[in-house]
Amino acid sequence: MPSAPRGFALFAGIAPDVIRACARRAEALGYTSFWVNHPGRTDGLAALAVAARETARIDLGVGVIPLHTRGPESILQGVREHALPLDRLLLGVGSPNPGALGRVRAGVAALRAGLRTRLVVAALGPKMCELAGEVADGVLFNWLTPEHARRSADLVRAGAARAGHRPPRLYAYVRLAVGAAARERLDEEAERYAAIPAYAA
């Protein structure tokens, strides 16, 4: 029985040499995707371009670019400027703010009109899960328990069914840390997300 697809993700602000080495190694080990995030002012697309130059087959994901701080035109420009390979790109977007559903729907439509690549939507709440199932090629879960992930997956499938197409592929971040301070780093990250209202709910 074949194993499930596995991805490897890094903080986009880490040193480029680390991105290069990890991207090469992930591809050599058979990982199916290599991801970076897009935190604050750190450009995830630029970090992903570093990985793209070191690899030939592995899918390349950015998860996710917040549409309330970077609009579709800026994202399109970034993808083109960095010459990201569209056949391998997993372009992740999301929005946690009020008006998120409309912003994500419009953003996905604009990106789809401008790029022939796979679009991934970050989904947490039930309405966003259903919307992601309707409009996206992939859905990214973050900081979910297995039970919450199963319920969210059902909502994604329901959205896809209403739209009349197959469900998108599901992705999930599973965080880990190594070293003597690993537990402390994970606890700090969990506390940071717990302070975000959408996750606290």
What are these model-derived regions, one by one?
Residues 1-201:
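Active-site-adjacent structural elements that line small-molecule/cofactor binding pockets in enzymes
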